[in-house]
C-alpha cells in the first residue's frame, strides 16, 4: 500500500494529542484523518469530556472525514468570496452529518461587507456565531518562526 504520511501520538496523564505528518507530494483522501481520529479515540480515557479535531481548510475529503462522528463543528470562515463559498458548502456538509454548528470569522477586518453577510447568514440559518478574530501580522511572523502565536 502507498503510505501517504506518518501517525504521531503524544500522551501524558491528562492529555492525548494525535496528529499526522503528510509525506511531501502525497494527497490526503481522508483516510489519514480517520486514522488520526481512531488513534486519538483508542488512546483516550473513557471519561474524556471532549476532543478537538483541527480539520484542514476547504471542503475536500479530509474535511468530510473530520466531520464524521462529532457532536459540534466550529467553522472558521474568512471574509472573502472564496471563503464565503467554502463556508456555505461546509455548513451544508455539516448539516448532512446532523452536527451542531458554531462559526467564527478569522481576519474579520479585511472585508467588513462580507463579515456582515456572514453574521446575517448565521442569524438567518440559526447558526451560533462565536465571534470575530482580527487580522494580525504577528500571527504570520510566529508561524514563519515556528513559534506559538501566544509568545
Give the predicted meaning of each segment:
Residues 19-28, 35-63:
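Switch II (G3) loop of P-loop NTPases
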Residues 53, 75, 103-105:
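Structural beta-sheet core signal
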Residues 1-12:
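Cys/His-rich short segments
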Residues 93-151:
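C-terminal lobe/tail of nucleotide-utilizing enzymes
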Residues 60-81, 87:
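Inter-motif core of Ras-like GTPase G domains
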Amino acid at each position: 500500500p502507498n503510505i501517504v504520511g506518518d501517525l504521531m501520538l503524544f500522551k501524558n496523564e491528562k492529555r492525548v494529542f494525535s496528529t499526522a505528518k503528510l509525506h511531501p507530494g502525497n494527497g490526503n483522501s481522508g483516510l489519514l484523518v480517520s486514522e488520526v481520529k481512531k488513534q486519538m479515540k483508542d488512546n483516550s480515557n473513557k471519561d474524556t469530556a471532549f476532543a478537538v479535531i483541527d480539520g484542514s481548510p476547504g471542503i475536500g475529503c479530509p474535511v468530510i472525514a473530520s466531520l464524521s462522528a462529532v457532536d459540534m463543528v466550529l467553522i472558521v470562515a474568512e471574509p472573502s468570496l472564496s471563503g464565503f463559498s467554502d463556508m456555505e458548502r461546509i455548513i451544508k456538509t455539516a448539516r448532512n452529518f446532523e452536527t451542531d454548528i458554531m462559526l467564527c470569522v478569522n481576519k474579520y477586518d479585511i472585508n467588513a461587507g462580507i463579515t456582515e453577510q456572514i453574521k446575517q447568514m448565521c442569524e438567518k440559518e440559526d447558526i451560533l456565531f462565536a465571534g470575530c478574530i482580527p487580522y494580525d501580522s504577528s500571527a504570520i511572523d510566529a508561524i514563519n518562526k515556528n513559534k506559538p502565536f501566544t509568545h
